[in-house]
From Swiss-Prot:
InterPro entries: AB_hydrolase_fold, DUF3657, DUF676_lipase-like, Lipase-like. Belongs to the FAM135 family. It comes from the Eukaryota. Residues 569-592, 1062-1093 are annotated as: Disordered. It holds the Pfam family DUF3657. Ubiquitous. GO terms for biological process: lipid metabolic process. It comes from Homo sapiens (Human). Residues 1082-1091 have a biased composition (Acidic residues). Residues 569-580 have a biased composition (Polar residues). This is Protein FAM135A.
Length: 1515
């Protein structure tokens, strides 16, 4: 082994020291040292670059390899001390020349920062005068090619709360023969194992032995006049020279490029004339010179000289770099922002969010709690936690690791969510059972079940999207088979669920898409409808959706009612209480949905396809109004087109076809042939409603489920006349909730269609194939009221998303899903929006493999940075974005997508060539590629890059100006592959710089428009959403993306996949597809029958079906959005973003493996808004805007092996099919501003936000110290004042009334003494303190402040007492304490302070108004906490209370008393958290105390909790 000497130089800048909350005044000093593993022979040299600034108490100094900072004195609270000490550490080491780069990348460079202190006399010469009080060790992850350039804030421990900001730059500066001797540790044996450590210096080798190898010996030539070199030694020399020169040149290139980037991005940075070097040419030149030398001595000298020259160049560049960037404030700010974003992103992993209908908050959800523990166990059994990549500068005490990072579950209860798609996860065993079924269908099932409806893009990590399954791609070819298997899966899951529940409870279960059993406490229970009814509904619904949903995109197809999503029987829906509407949404929607209503196309196209109205879902309004009987909606649809406000589920007004029950199959109806008329083409500016509205022959809304076989013939489509726009509009006008505030007027044939405002509650969330929820795209979800469309007839706002989803979904799934989707669609609008955002990013990076053998080759997912750098090229990763579900394959085998550069004129032609069920839609998006180039463009990086760019910048001026996208898609097959041919025209005023700069690439809309009739035209936009148009709409937030959850053909899934087959004319494709569709329909029918049996049992999972993807005409804010929409069909853009017309950064969805689709270095302006213009959670207007410069793929700078391992782990996680979504897929998190980055503005006129922190039993005012610290750090610049209550700390065993009086006096006195102008008041309570806070709210003296209440953060608060605590040990201890202390508070907690339970303190407190005055009610509990029962902390029903015949009713009444006002208040947002801490095996953990206090003293939990989600509650 030949060893070479390497030198890595580190520049460590200590910028500022912040006194966060130090207890003692005195002198402080920071000492830094560098360490590397002793197994590597090394020497460390330390020096100070130059003394700068004031010397403070004493100047900085160097002691051997230890550097001491300036010694400074701390006297005041929140004091900041400028250090500006620049320390240089030169690490010289011996490395194996064969493994130089690998060794450097894997080496642990450890930077130790020690805080020393003294409060006495101090002399700079005496190092021992200062005592060590706290220490942090930073692990520096160095790359020989990129170096290291990072900034971190290092916080010392809880007892010495202070922060030092550190900037680190590092580079490889030298590689050459060993010039000095290095001490080598002597290996110890068992004989001398106790001997003191010994070192011996290494021998300095000769130059020849280094260059030619250790065994080299000189050999004379035969003539004796010269020396000769054996070939082996000569090859060693060449390899040695090449390796070292290449490493040095790459290090030079990396440092040079970073230097250039810094000088360009920071205007004030000194500009230097840096020498450009062609690395490859220089390397080739050096190698050629060496090969010309024959004399061994000359060869060794030349190699040594070349290395010396390169080292000198590198050292000179490093010196220039340090001279320019050292202590550069703007660079420090830039690096701080980057580190903060990466850190928050890392925290967002394993932070799950579930969205539920608002009414579900009162439901009994024991299964949810159990599933959280099962999910944690399953996650820890995977490699996900252990493979979590570290940050570039890592501190495990601050950033967490496998043994310290908690897993957090968030439950949101949103008006926009009408169906509980996030069913409890019943464990791996269920998954394994369903594994027998095809992944494709399973994925769709999961996605629909999980229904990512988060304001943020929901990428269902576990289960969500088909794209995660590499196996799915292989299965695409077996799509038909997969469908049946998947249906089996869902049945298995449902069956398992049923088994887990007791029969008595099952009766109470509301049939939900989510599969989870929910018992509504105090609400009327739904009766399970007969299986026949359910089946009928499903069958009927499919037909509607197909009919109308197809409209623009559906040319013709046969579909069987079975293909439609199952719907609960109309009876069932009618039985539902209005309050339960959301919970049940699924069934009601189904019922309400007539064949046309469920049509995702109709609803989705809402303006686009009036036909697609989803009666059930659309009707749902943001307010709590429930879906009324579907039958009523159906009827109302026809009869009351004008009923805008109708709170009943808006029915789109689609005609229904009456289908008689089939004699053959009890679950299906007779086949009916429906011919759709051609759609009329509207002006580009107008939304083509005609296209959206297919002409259906008679539809009867008798509520009977019927299967309709719709055969679309190419000629029929072209020739048939479409219904008048008015009729279609009438269909659309389902009764929509009045709530929508803003409306888009879409002119269709002179008629206006209003899209529902975001206020509408129906936001549909779906899993896109990529695993991202598509829900964000739903109109209802869109926060921007502007995006809302009103149906012309005064129908309520319709969710175009809902209308479109089916079309968007894979055809097979579409049919089924169309109904099911509607059911599942309702999810929070916010989440939907976010999902769409995420999906956008993922689109470019997501590569899909078509099931076709043609598309077998996998596309390498790459995200291109703006600088055209590929962030990650992990090699080919197969992501079957299409669920590979053959069903859902709206398969356009040869579909290709071409994006044109300009949104305004761009037309997207969707041509489906041969749509085989097997083949998922594949889309190639490139600005430059023509249809002929499509194939290559999929894999080509430039195309991906351009695509990414286009998608990323959804029009920086996300003007609300809508673009009308006209899709004249001639063929859409529901239930089977859909072929869409047509063009999408988008009118957008938005200027799209980057995304679509090439007009030539895309056909003009007019051209496409004219070409639409001839599908054979060459450019195919192949938007897999059936159609990009719909996707685009979703992007805008006008329409919910249905494809997301259930359609495996989501664009995002299919994008980047190209078919090798040539495109075929529409005629051929339509005919072929029709036949294929019929075949698939038959198979789907079988599946439907099975599914319907499940429906009969009351456990139907809509997730099994994907809604059909449809083309949607919508106004798009920007063309980028359109493109993003298509690409990220699965991921939905946050409606908020769209709504606000904000530019949205592309976000990678899980489907894209977290590859940032947006160039990492190009910041995208993003406004943090949720569904509506209000923050998704806080409902407060979002005012935070910032540059989202960091890529979602926070781990992109990690070594490639680590990235691959982590991505593989994420895929494993996806296979678990976990419900909900992870915050890591959300584009914007709660914290975007680095610590200490904003100066506080004293001149603010808004007043002070007073946050009152109240401790618990036997606590003190310092208990919530860390909570206060992380809120202050996370919200720099805000006018926040903390009152750390101390009035009760001397006696927390008193009764609550006396403690309430003390706290109230303390608050009022604090405000008066400091003359505070209070604009907001928030409360944070721990344990018992939460009840004191609630009691204060009921006092007359506090009445004046009720209108200022903002957020109530309850940390493990016993709101329902300790009545049903499962820990006998804790119960005994509390009983003893109550007797010993004669504690009134403990007696009141057990509800034994009065003989009449309704006269106890807790019951009477629950009857008093209070919580609903807050904008946010945040309840944090933990299943590991045995001091306070989990259900009491989260105010929810527990299993024990249900069985208790005596106190159980009281318990239920308390829950209703507390939550009913909260749920009825539109301004009050309810969120619950379950924290699973990584606790050590100690006595505290055993008795449950560790988890109870972890919410106070776990820095990692608090930082993760606030940075990712909770800070927004205090903004």
């Amino acid at each position: 082994m030949t060893e070479v000497q390497a030198m890595v130089e580190f520049s460590v800048e200590l910028n500022k020291f912040y006194n966060v909350d130090l207890f003692q005044r005195g002198f402080y000093q920071i000492r830094a040292s560098m360490k590397i593993p002793s197994r590597i022979p090394h020497r460390v040299e330390a020096s100070l670059l130059h003394a700068t600034g004031m010397t403070l108490a004493f100047p900085a100094s160097v002691h051997d390899s230890l550097i001491c900072s300036k010694t400074f004195q701390i006297l005041y609270k929140n004091e900041e001390v400028v250090l500006n000490d620049v320390m240089i550490f030169k690490v010289k080491m011996l490395l194996d020349e064969r493994k130089i780069e690998e060794t450097l990348e894997e080496m642990n460079f450890l930077l130790s920062l020690d805080l020393h202190f003294t409060d006495g006399d101090y002399s700079a010469d005496d190092l021992n005068a200062l005592q060590l009080i706290s220490s942090r060790t930073l692990k520096l992850h160095f790359s020989p090619h990129r170096g290291l350039h990072h900034h971190v804030n290092v916080m010392f421990d809880y007892f010495h709360l202070s922060v030092v900001s550190v900037t680190v730059h590092a580079s490889l500066v030298a590689l050459h023969q060993p010039l000095i001797s290095f001490p080598r540790p002597v290996k110890t044996t068992w004989l001398n194992r106790n001997a003191p450590a010994q070192n011996k210096d290494s021998v300095i080798p000769t130059l020849e032995s280094v260059v030619f190898g250790i065994n080299y010996t000189k050999q004379l030539s035969p003539d004796g006049c010269s020396f000769i070199i054996a070939d082996s030694f000569l090859h060693h020399a060449y390899r040695f020279h090449y390796t070292l020169c290449a490493t040095l040149l790459l290090a030079f290139k990396g440092l040079h490029s970073y230097f250039i980037t810094v000088t360009e991005e920071i205007p004030s940075c000194q500009k230097l004339e840096l020498e450009e070097m062609d690395v490859e040419a220089r390397l080739t030149e050096l190698c050629e010179e060496v090969k010309k030398i024959e004399n061994p001595d000359e060869l060794a000298e030349l190699i040594n000289m070349n290395l010396a020259q390169l080292c000198s160049l590198l050292m000179a560049l490093w010196g220039q770099f340090l001279e320019v960037i050292t202590l550069h404030e703007e660079l420090r700010i830039l690096l701080a922002q980057e580190h903060h974003t990466l850190r928050v992103r890392r925290f967002s992993e394993a932070f799950f969010c579930f969205e539920h209908p608002r009414e579900a908050a009162i439901a009994y959800q024991e299964l949810h709690a159990q599933s959280h523990l099962q999910m944690c166990t399953a996650i820890k059994n995977t490699s996900f936690c252990s493979s979590l990549p570290p940050l570039p500068i890592e501190c495990s005490e601050l950033d967490g690791d496998l043994n310290s990072l908690p897993i957090i579950f968030e439950d949101r209860y949103l008006d926009s969510v009408t169906e509980d798609l996030d069913a409890p996860w019943m464990g791996i065993q269920n998954l394994q059972r369903s594994e027998s079924s095809k992944m494709d269908k399973y994925e769709t099932e999961e996605s629909s079940v999980a229904g990512l409806s988060s304001p943020e893009l929901k990428v269902r990590p576990a289960g969500a999207s088909s794209i995660w399954y590499t196996e799915g791609e292989k299965q695409l070819t077996k799509s038909l088979k997969g469908k049946n298997e998947e249906s089996n899966k869902s049945k298995v899951k449902v069956t398992k669920l049923m088994k887990t529940m007791k029969s008595e409870n099952t009766k109470k279960l509301i049939k939900q898409n989510s599969k989870d059993s929910v018992v509504l406490v105090g609400y009327k229970c739904l009766k399970s409808t007969a299986s026949n009814d359910l089946i009928k509904c499903f069958e009927g619904n499919p037909s509607h959706s197909q009919k109308e949903g197809l409209d623009p995109t559906i040319c013709g197809y046969n579909f069987d009612p079975k293909t439609y999503m199952r719907q609960t029987s109309q009876k069932e829906a009618s039985c539902l209480p209005t309050n339960t509407e959301r919970t049940e949404q699924k069934s009601p929607d189904i019922e309400n949905v007539q064949p046309d209503q469920f049509d995702p196309l109709n609803s989705g196209n809402l303006n686009l396809c009036a036909n697609l109205s989803i009666s059930g879902k659309l009707d749902i309004s943001q307010d709590d109004s429930e879906i009324t009987q579907m039958e009523h909606n159906l009827a109302s649809r026809r009869s009351s087109d004008d009923c805008h406000d109708h709170q009943t589920t808006p029915s789109l007004g689609v005609r229904t076809i009456e289908i008689k029950p089939s004699n053959k199959d009890p679950f299906s109806g007779e086949n009916i042939t429906v011919k759709l008329g051609p759609w009329t083409e509207l002006r580009q500016e107008e939304i083509l409603v005609d296209n959206l509205l297919p002409n259906f022959e008679s539809l009867e809304s008798n509520g009977k489920s019927k299967s309709i076989e719709i055969t679309f013939e190419k000629e029929a489509l072209q020739e048939a006349k479409c219904l008048s726009i008015g009729e279609s509009l009438t269909k659309l006008r389902s009764n929509l909730p009045a709530p929508s505030t803003k409306e888009y007027h879409v002119v269709v044939s002179g008629d206006t269609i209003k899209l529902p405002d975001i206020s509408a509650t129906y936001a549909s969330s779906r899993f896109s194939d990529s695993g991202v929820e598509s829900e964000p795209s739903s109109f209802a979800t869109h926060p921007n009221t502007d995006l809302v469309f009103e149906t012309v007839q005064g129908q309520g706002p319709c969710n175009s998303e809902r209308l479109f989803p089916q079309l968007l979904m894979k055809p097979d799934y579409n049919v089924k899903f169309s109904l099911g989707n509607h059911c599942t669609e309702s999810t929070s609008a916010i989440s939907e929006i976010q999902s769409s955002l995420t999906s956008i990013n993922s689109l470019p990076s997501d590569d899909e493999l078509s099931p076709d053998e043609n598309s077998k080759k996998s596309v390498v997912p790459e995200c291109h940075l703006n600088d055209s750098k590929t962030v990650l090229n992990l090699g080919t990763t197969d992501l079957p974005k299409c669920d590979d579900t053959k069903k859902s394959s709206i398969t356009l085998q040869q579909q290709s997508v071409v994006f044109s550069g300009n949104l305004d004129n761009e037309t997207v032609a969707i041509h489906s060539l041969n749509s085989s069920i097997k083949d998922p839609l594949q889309f190639v998006f490139s600005d430059e590629e023509t249809s002929s180039d499509v194939k290559s463009s999929c894999s080509s990086k430039p195309n991906l890059d351009t695509m990414c760019k286009g998608f990323q910048s959804p029009d920086k001026s996300n003007n609300s100006t809508g673009t009308a996208i006209t899709l004249n898609s001639k063929l859409i097959c529901l239930g089977t592959p859909c072929v869409i041919s047509g063009s999408i025209s988008s009118n957008t005023d938005v200027s799209e710089d980057r995304t679509m700069k090439k007009n030539s690439d895309v056909l003009n809309l007019t051209q496409m428009y004219s070409e639409i009739p001839t599908v054979e035209s060459e450019t195919h936009l192949g938007t897999s959403d059936p159609f990009s148009a719909s996707t685009d709409i979703v992007k805008q937030g006008l329409v919910e993306n249905y494809f997301g959850s259930q359609s495996s053909t989501d664009i995002s899934d299919t994008c980047a996949v190209s078919y090798s087959n040539a495109l075929s004319p529409q005629k051929e494709t339509s005919e072929k597809e029709i036949s294929n569709l019929q075949q698939e329909q038959d198979k789907e029918d079988e599946e439907e029958e099975q599914d319907q049996q499940m429906v009969q049992n009351g456990y139907y999972e809509e997730t099994d079906y994907s809604a059909l993807d449809g083309t949607i005409n919508a106004h798009y804010t920007s063309r980028d959005e359109l493109m993003e929409e298509r690409l990220t069909k699965s991921e939905k853009i946050n409606s908020d973003y769209l709504r606000d017309g904000i530019n949205m950064p592309t976000v990678c969805t899980s489907g894209c493996l977290s590859f940032p689709s947006a160039p990492r270095e190009s910041p995208c302006n993003v406004k943090y808004s949720s569904k509506s213009k209000f923050d998704a959670i806080t409902k407060q207007p979002s005012s935070t805007s910032y540059n989202f410069t960091s890529s979602i793929s926070w781990y992109e700078s990690s070594p490639k092996p680590q990235i691959q391992a982590f991505l593989q782990a994420k895929e494993e996680l996806k296979l678990l099919k976990l419900p909900g979504f992870m915050y890591s897929e959300v584009p914007l998190l709660a914290s975007s501003v680095p610590y200490f980055s904003v100066e506080e503005e004293d001149g603010s006129e808004d007043g002070v936000h007073l946050i009152v922190c109240v401790h618990g039993l036997d606590g003190n005012s310092a208990d919530l110290r860390l909570v206060k610290t992380y809120i202050e750090l996370g919200l720099p610049g805000g006018r926040i004042d903390f009152l750390m209550s101390e009035r009760n700390q001397n006696d927390t065993f008193a009764d609550f009334d006396s403690m309430t009086d003390r706290l109230l006096d303390e608050i009022i006195q604090y405000i008066q003494i400091y003359s505070l102008t209070v604009s907001k008041i928030s409360f944070i309570g721990h344990s018992l303190g939460n009840l004191i806070i609630r009691s204060v709210l009921t006092r007359p003296r506090f009445k004046y402040y009720l209108n200022k209440l903002h957020t109530f953060l309850s940390l493990s608060g016993p709101h329902l007492g300790t009545l049903y605590n499962s820990s006998a040990l804790v119960n005994t201890g509390l009983w003893f304490m109550q007797k010993w202390k004669k504690s009134g508070s403990l007696l009141q907690l057990t509800c034994r302070d009065h003989s009449d339970p309704r006269q106890t303190f807790l019951y009477k407190l629950s009857n008093k108004a209070g919580l609903h005055y807050f904008k946010n009610v945040v309840l944090v509990g933990s299943l590991q906490d045995r001091y306070v029962p989990y259900h009491s902390a989260r105010i929810e029903m527990c299993k024990t209370a249900l069985k208790d015949k005596q106190s159980g009713q009281i318990y239920s009444e308390m829950i209703h008393n507390l939550l009913r006002p909260v749920l009825q208040s539109k301004d009050c947002n309810l969120v619950r958290y379950n924290v699973i801490n990584a606790l050590p095996n100690t006595a505290d953990s055993l008795i449950g105390r560790a988890a109870h206090i972890a919410v106070l003293d776990s820095e990692i939990f608090l930082e993760k909790f606030f940075l990712v989600a909770a800070l927004k509650y205090f903004q």
